[in-house]
Amino acid sequence: MGEVKLFFGPNHPGMHGNFSVHMYVEGDTVVKARPLPGFLHRGFEKLMERRLWYQNLALIPRICVPEPDINELCYALAVEKIAKIDVPERAQWIRMIVLELARIANHLWSFSGIGGPIGLYTGSFWGTADRDRILDIFENLTGARVYHMYIVPGGVRKDLTPKIEKMILETLDYIESRLPDYEKLILKNRIVHTRLKGIAKLDRETALEMGVTGVGLRATGVPYDIRKVDPYLFYDKVDFEVPFSTDGDAFARVYLKFREIFQSIKIVKQALEKMPVGKVNTPISEGSALRFRVPKGQAYVHIESTRGEYGYYMVSDGGEKPYRVVVRGASYPQTFIGVEKYLPGTRIEDVPIWLSTMDVCAPEVDR
C-alpha cells in the first residue's frame, strides 16, 4: 500500500492541545512525522512589549493554561532581579506553596490525560475530580481557579489566612490518602503495564540532544531538577528527593509523576511549618503600580515547572514597558523538536501516549 499521510490533530481526541502532527504511516507504523504549530499563536512575547509592566500580569498566566503560576513566578523573578527588589520571606514561602500545589494539580491532571489513550477512564475521572480540590484552594486564595494573577513583582497579592492554611493541610491529607488507590489502579494494573511499559521509550542521549527536561529527562536516568541544581526561593531549606528512573518509557514517566506528588506534599507541609509571620509584598512604586518602571538592565531566570526547565530572558530599557521578553518553554523541546525524532517507529495508537506523558502545552509552544 505504501506511505499514507495522516493528519493527526488539532481536533483529534488523542491530541493534547490545539496543534497538529502530519504523520506518514505504513500500515499502523509511523515512518516520518512533521509538527505543524500555529493554531494557538497569539504572540505573547510581542504583546508583552506593548503593555505596561504591571498589565502583563493578566497576560502571562495564559502562556501555559494548566500551569499559570510558573509564568507568574518567572516574570516576577526577572523583574525583581533587574530592579533589585527584596521580597519578604513570608512571600517567598507562600510562592513555594503555590508552585507545589500547582505541581500536584498538574500531575493529577496528567493521570486524567493518560486515561483516555489507554482506555482507563476511571483514572481520568479520579484525576480531574481530585485536581478540582486544589483549584478550590486557588479560588479561595486568589479569587480565580485557573488564571490566578497572584504572584506579583515584590511578593504575592494576598496573604495566607489560617482558614486557607487549614484547607491546604486537609486537602493534602486527602490526596495523600488517595495515592494508594492511584497506585493500585495505574501502577499495579497489568493492562496498564501492557500499554505503557516499553512504549514511547526515550533514551538518555536523545533526550539530552533535544533539550528535554523535567520528568521526560529524569525518566532516562538523569536526576536533573533546578530546585536542587540551582535552588531558588527556599528550596534549599526544605528536605525533598528527586525521583528518577532509567527505563525511559511511558510507564516510567507516569511513575515519576506519582512519586513527585509525595515530594510536593512533603515540601508544602514543611513550608507551612517554616513560614514566618510578616508582610507578603514589597511596594514596587509610589502611587499607582501602573506607573512602575523597571531600571535599564537584563536578566535570565529559570525554574523547575511540572514540564521541566522554564526560563525568562528579560530586557528593560528603563521605560514603562518591557523592551524584550523571551520565554523558554519547557514543553517545546519534547514536542515540536522531539516529534520528528521519537515518533518514527511508533504505532499510531501509541502516539497519544507519547504526547500525554511528555506533557504537551500547546499555548506555551505557540507563544
UniProtKB/Swiss-Prot annotation:
Catalytic activity: a quinone + NADH + 5 H(+)(in) = a quinol + NAD(+) + 4 H(+)(out)
Keywords (A to Z) from UniProt: Cell inner membrane, Cell membrane, Membrane, NAD, Quinone, Translocase, Transport, Ubiquinone
Record carries keyword Membrane: yes
Cellular component GO terms held in the UniProt record: plasma membrane
Origin superkingdom: Bacteria
InterPro entries on file: NADH_Q_OxRdtase_suD, NADH_UbQ_OxRdtase_49kDa_CS, NDH1_su_D/H, NiFe-Hase_large
Membrane topology value: Peripheral membrane protein
GO molecular function, one term: NAD binding
Pfam families linked to this entry: Complex1_49kDa
Enzyme Commission code(s) on record: 7.1.1.-
Keyword Isomerase attributed: no
Disulfide bonds: none
Subcellular location: Cell inner membrane
Enzyme class: translocase
Alphabetical list of SUPFAM superfamilies matching this protein: HydB/Nqo4-like (SSF56762)
Function noted in UniProt: NDH-1 shuttles electrons from NADH, via FMN and iron-sulfur (Fe-S) centers, to quinones in the respiratory chain. The immediate electron acceptor for the enzyme in this species is believed to be ubiquinone. Couples the redox reaction to proton translocation (for every two electrons transferred, four hydrogen ions are translocated across the cytoplasmic membrane), and thus conserves the redox energy in a proton gradient.
Xref: HAMAP family: NDH1_NuoD
Assembly mode: NDH-1 is composed of 14 different subunits. Subunits NuoB, C, D, E, F, and G constitute the peripheral sector of the complex.
Entry similarity comment: Belongs to the complex I 49 kDa subunit family.
Database matches in NCBIfam families: PRK06075.1
Protein name: NADH-quinone oxidoreductase subunit D
Organism: Thermosipho melanesiensis (strain DSM 12029 / CIP 104789 / BI429)
